[in-house]
A protein has these predicted regions:
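N-terminal subdomain of nucleotide-sugar transferases
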Residues: 1-49, 53, 94
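Extended catalytic core of nucleotide-activated donor transferases of GT-like folds
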Residues: 50-146
Length: 147
Protein backbone atom coordinates (compact mmCIF):
# COMPACT_ATOMS: atom_id res chain seq x y z
CA UNK A 1 0.00 0.00 0.00
CA UNK A 2 1.35 3.40 -1.01
CA UNK A 3 2.10 5.76 1.85
CA UNK A 4 0.09 8.98 1.97
CA UNK A 5 2.19 12.11 1.59
CA UNK A 6 1.45 14.65 4.31
CA UNK A 7 2.80 18.20 4.11
CA UNK A 8 2.86 19.94 7.49
CA UNK A 9 3.38 23.71 7.33
CA UNK A 10 4.27 25.73 10.43
CA UNK A 11 7.32 27.01 12.31
CA UNK A 12 10.45 24.88 11.89
CA UNK A 13 10.16 21.88 14.21
CA UNK A 14 13.37 22.87 15.99
CA UNK A 15 12.29 26.47 16.56
CA UNK A 16 11.79 27.33 20.21
CA UNK A 17 8.16 28.36 19.74
CA UNK A 18 4.84 26.82 20.69
CA UNK A 19 4.10 26.09 17.04
CA UNK A 20 7.57 24.60 16.55
CA UNK A 21 7.26 22.27 19.53
CA UNK A 22 3.73 21.25 18.55
CA UNK A 23 4.90 20.49 15.02
CA UNK A 24 7.90 18.52 16.30
CA UNK A 25 5.66 16.35 18.46
CA UNK A 26 3.25 15.72 15.58
CA UNK A 27 6.02 14.96 13.07
CA UNK A 28 7.81 12.61 15.48
CA UNK A 29 4.63 10.69 16.19
CA UNK A 30 3.69 10.34 12.51
CA UNK A 31 7.27 9.48 11.53
CA UNK A 32 7.44 6.71 14.13
CA UNK A 33 4.28 5.07 12.76
CA UNK A 34 6.07 4.50 9.44
CA UNK A 35 2.77 5.03 7.64
CA UNK A 36 3.40 8.41 6.00
CA UNK A 37 5.75 10.18 3.65
CA UNK A 38 6.27 13.39 5.63
CA UNK A 39 7.14 16.79 4.24
CA UNK A 40 7.91 19.62 6.63
CA UNK A 41 7.45 23.14 5.28
CA UNK A 42 9.22 25.32 7.83
CA UNK A 43 8.41 28.97 8.41
CA UNK A 44 11.40 31.04 9.46
CA UNK A 45 14.09 29.32 7.39
CA UNK A 46 14.98 29.39 3.70
CA UNK A 47 14.06 26.62 1.22
CA UNK A 48 17.43 24.83 1.30
CA UNK A 49 18.76 26.06 4.65
CA UNK A 50 21.27 23.78 6.36
CA UNK A 51 18.72 23.06 9.12
CA UNK A 52 16.50 21.24 6.61
CA UNK A 53 19.03 18.40 6.59
CA UNK A 54 18.89 17.87 10.38
CA UNK A 55 15.58 16.00 10.52
CA UNK A 56 14.76 12.44 9.39
CA UNK A 57 11.93 13.51 7.04
CA UNK A 58 11.97 15.78 4.00
CA UNK A 59 12.12 19.41 5.07
CA UNK A 60 12.11 22.67 3.13
CA UNK A 61 12.07 26.22 4.39
CA UNK A 62 9.14 28.50 3.61
CA UNK A 63 11.10 31.76 3.71
CA UNK A 64 12.26 33.22 0.38
CA UNK A 65 15.81 34.48 -0.07
CA UNK A 66 16.25 37.98 1.43
CA UNK A 67 16.85 39.47 -2.03
CA UNK A 68 13.34 38.35 -3.06
CA UNK A 69 11.75 39.97 -0.01
CA UNK A 70 13.49 43.36 -0.24
CA UNK A 71 11.32 44.75 -3.04
CA UNK A 72 8.02 43.82 -1.40
CA UNK A 73 5.75 46.07 0.63
CA UNK A 74 5.42 45.32 4.38
CA UNK A 75 2.20 43.30 3.97
CA UNK A 76 3.75 41.14 1.25
CA UNK A 77 6.89 40.67 3.37
CA UNK A 78 4.74 39.45 6.27
CA UNK A 79 2.92 37.01 3.96
CA UNK A 80 6.22 35.66 2.67
CA UNK A 81 7.36 35.15 6.27
CA UNK A 82 4.56 32.58 6.45
CA UNK A 83 5.50 30.94 3.14
CA UNK A 84 2.82 32.42 0.89
CA UNK A 85 4.70 31.65 -2.37
CA UNK A 86 6.85 28.71 -1.33
CA UNK A 87 3.83 26.72 -0.17
CA UNK A 88 2.83 26.62 -3.85
CA UNK A 89 6.29 25.36 -4.79
CA UNK A 90 6.09 22.67 -2.09
CA UNK A 91 2.64 21.53 -3.27
CA UNK A 92 3.86 21.35 -6.86
CA UNK A 93 7.10 19.53 -6.02
CA UNK A 94 5.88 17.04 -3.41
CA UNK A 95 2.25 16.55 -4.51
CA UNK A 96 0.91 15.85 -1.03
CA UNK A 97 -2.31 13.98 -0.36
CA UNK A 98 -2.85 16.11 2.74
CA UNK A 99 -1.88 19.69 3.63
CA UNK A 100 -1.89 20.62 7.33
CA UNK A 101 -1.30 24.28 8.16
CA UNK A 102 -0.60 25.06 11.82
CA UNK A 103 -0.31 28.78 12.47
CA UNK A 104 -2.17 31.93 13.49
CA UNK A 105 -5.11 32.56 11.18
CA UNK A 106 -3.53 35.55 9.42
CA UNK A 107 -0.84 33.25 8.01
CA UNK A 108 -3.39 31.67 5.65
CA UNK A 109 -4.68 34.80 3.91
CA UNK A 110 -5.63 33.92 0.35
CA UNK A 111 -4.87 30.20 0.68
CA UNK A 112 -8.46 29.18 -0.03
CA UNK A 113 -8.09 30.88 -3.45
CA UNK A 114 -4.99 28.90 -4.40
CA UNK A 115 -5.58 26.48 -7.30
CA UNK A 116 -4.53 23.45 -5.26
CA UNK A 117 -6.68 24.25 -2.19
CA UNK A 118 -9.69 22.10 -3.13
CA UNK A 119 -7.65 19.53 -5.06
CA UNK A 120 -6.12 17.93 -1.96
CA UNK A 121 -7.26 17.33 1.61
CA UNK A 122 -6.60 20.47 3.61
CA UNK A 123 -6.64 21.05 7.34
CA UNK A 124 -5.96 24.23 9.26
CA UNK A 125 -5.06 24.07 12.92
CA UNK A 126 -5.12 27.60 14.24
CA UNK A 127 -5.23 29.30 17.60
CA UNK A 128 -8.58 30.78 18.55
CA UNK A 129 -7.28 32.59 21.59
CA UNK A 130 -9.02 35.94 21.34
CA UNK A 131 -12.51 37.07 22.11
CA UNK A 132 -14.28 37.88 20.02
CA UNK A 133 -12.89 35.32 17.58
CA UNK A 134 -11.17 37.16 14.76
CA UNK A 135 -13.38 37.71 11.70
CA UNK A 136 -10.62 36.13 9.56
CA UNK A 137 -11.12 32.85 11.41
CA UNK A 138 -14.90 32.94 11.09
CA UNK A 139 -14.69 33.76 7.36
CA UNK A 140 -12.04 31.10 6.68
CA UNK A 141 -13.68 28.19 8.53
CA UNK A 142 -16.24 27.25 5.83
CA UNK A 143 -13.47 27.27 3.20
CA UNK A 144 -11.47 24.55 4.97
CA UNK A 145 -12.49 20.90 4.86
CA UNK A 146 -10.99 20.20 8.28
CA UNK A 147 -10.79 23.19 10.61
Amino acid sequence: MKKKTVLIHSNFCRAFTGFGKNKKNLLRYLFNTGKYNLIELANGIEWEAAQTETVPWTCRGALPHPSEIQGLNPDQQRQEGYGNKLVDKAIEEFKPDVYIGIEDIWAFGGYSNKPWWNQINTMVWTTLDSLPILPQAVDFAPKVKHY
